[in-house]
Amino acid sequence: MSRRGTAEEKTAKSDPIYRNRLVNMLVNRILKHGKKSLAYQIIYRAVKKIQQKTETNPLSVLRQAIRGVTPDIAVKARRVGGSTHQVPIEIGSTQGKALAIRWLLGASRKRPGRNMAFKLSSELVDAAKGSGDAIRKKEETHRMAEANRAFAHFR
């Protein structure tokens, strides 16, 4: 048994310009090879493009997109008696936001287009409207959980 105490849960810091935790979570997920300044550049350009496209507050569009993509329930592989079942589990808010951000970035990376800022802004605007690959991924996850509802007692 470990003698160390339980680690304190770190609170998510907010970014320097918008003072927003979601923006910081997005920056930390888009980060590659430790190039944080480049990640900030991409996010801020995407936010400016959202401002130009929608002519509304870009942070509210970001919040709306993440809220739209955040799943309520997901499936987890659980091995029972030699066979693996997809067991539906409820997801907490932090984990749901993390999944939503991961799906948004994955969908924007797959998009054809000029640069990452443009692709990310397009995906965020689409997600806020209720369309796009990330929304489809959420719906697919919900369908999967609904289909495997019979295994919910394996939790």
From Swiss-Prot:
InterPro entries: Ribosomal_uS7, Ribosomal_uS7_bac/org-type, Ribosomal_uS7_CS, Ribosomal_uS7_dom, Ribosomal_uS7_dom_sf
CDD domains: uS7_Chloroplast
Keywords: Chloroplast, Plastid, Ribonucleoprotein, Ribosomal protein, RNA-binding, rRNA-binding
GO cellular component, one term: small ribosomal subunit
Localization (cell): Plastid, Chloroplast
Record keyword Plastid present: yes
Gene Ontology BP terms: translation
Pfam families named among the record's database cross-references: Ribosomal_S7
Subunit annotation: Part of the 30S ribosomal subunit.
PANTHER family: RIBOSOMAL PROTEIN S7
Protein name: Small ribosomal subunit protein uS7cz/uS7cy
